[in-house]
């Protein structure tokens, strides 16, 4: 609501009993009444589902290969003398800058997932081994990536093929009850037949009638 709270002029209040809805924004043109919005499918993140990926976060042994790994555009250099735990921390830090996050299991690095939800979520991982120290394949293998990699013939850079070993992010799917009795009540939804829904990740925006808008995530 765009009206000031200080002078007590707020006339539109929105309540939710769903702890997973963190914020609801409504325009000044929303009419008081019953609204029913059903989340059919929750938004998801892009995820790395490769097998045989695991760097022990407390390992003291040297990784044995050097190169550069890029996670969603955030690059970090890894030295052959870095311990597994040091490599783990470097990858974790790069992932955070690259809008990704570690997926851990029993203290080991088991993969990455995008920080954002929805179809715009990205998870692009590339490996580039340093010449004379290790091949790019050796470097990627040392980091635990042994499958589902494609190589650029010109640069030798290997890209994690998310299409083969990952799940793309998806937007939420919602359903509006238009002119129907809401379950368990005698009230009907006051959405009109022209109500439309737009989703962007886990953000849902509903427009209906002139000036009406409702957005939540």
Model-predicted segments: where are they?
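Bacterial flagellar/type III secretion structural subunits and associated motility module proteins
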Residues: 3-217
